[in-house]
Amino acid sequence: MRKSFYFPVLLLLALAANANSQTSGVPAAEWKRLASPEQAGWSGKKLAGIRDYLEEIGSTSAMIVQHGVVVAAWGDVAHKSNLHSCRKSLLNSLIGIAVADGKINLDETLEKLGIDDKKPSLTDVEKQATVRDLLEARSGVYHAAAYETKGMAEERPQRGSHAPGTFWYYNNWDFNTLGHIYETATGTKIFDAFYREIAQPIGMQDFTPRDGHYVTSPDSLYPAYLFDISARDFARFALLYLHDGKWNDTQVVPEDWVKASTRPYSDAESGGYGYLWWTGDSASGEPQRISFPKGSFWAEGHLGQYAVVVPSLDLIVVNRVDGDMTKRTVHKRQVARLVEMVVAAAPGN
């Protein structure tokens, strides 16, 4: 029998609340959902094709949001599961607030901050990496890290092979150390801070501080910080960045920080990399192997966790894969195809 996505009845009723073309751009306590995507200009046939494609590739839930309203949703979007590496984009928001508050200086070095690690400890050269270098994944510190897969460990460059700031390598050591720097600078645990500074102001419906946990390693001092978040809360976070950090009349994350974070500083196979966000544009301007819409940016995590923001269309595409529900992985090229299909189904295309 053909598998189908399901929706809890109460959630469906909530999402199906009347949603007209005139909206505030952000959801209130509940998401609004288009009563008829076709009447709003969306292709019903192409949306059905997207549903079939999601089942084909193994997504466990997904959402399309335009103008702050749910166009379509599949799966249990209230179910919380591991965001994996999307955690880094979440941390970005907290660091941006701390920078604006004067608690973190992007140009401070690891040496100045007293950062070292287990033996073999950091060299004097490695300690010259700055907070900015870590945000860009250009620290040049290739120490073992918590929550590092076997493949990541095998691909890690040799220690001392690149000076700080000169080479991009997607590096869990950088990201985990940023978490430590944030907690030390603010005196607040990441999950408590995220709940207070982000989740509550933007009305996340499901997240609590208990939905975060740390993963440690015998090889490094700095733990990974993992978030279990629902698809609908993840979509709210993406919408916050689509709106340059503003939610209704409140500037939750500084606008200049959002803009700095979502521009490319390095090239990657699908475009570029900013401050803990992936970008559809490359830093060099050269086309890359996997194509996302121009000007887009996204959070990305293991197994197929994505929140893709397409500012030119006021559009968000969320894809989730719960590893407790399936053994499948949705790959980046498949997500690029998903976004392409969504854009093709949108009004005017």
Indicate residue ranges for each PLM-predicted region.
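Bacterial N-terminal signal peptides
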Residues: 7-16
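Active-site-proximal loop and beta-strand segments within enzyme catalytic domains
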Residues: 25-35, 45-49, 87, 96-170
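A short, well-structured edge-of-sheet supersecondary motif
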Residues: 47-77, 307-308, 314-318
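Active-site SXXK
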Residues: 68, 82-107, 134, 178-182, ...
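Active-site-proximal alpha-helical segments within enzyme catalytic domains
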Residues: 89, 177-181, 225-246, 305-321
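Active-site helix/loop module of the DD-peptidase/beta-lactamase fold
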Residues: 100-137, 186-224, 229
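Active-site Gly/Thr loop motif
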Residues: 206, 211, 263-316
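Structured C-terminal helix/loop/strand segments within mature extracytoplasmic catalytic/sensor domains
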Residues: 299-349
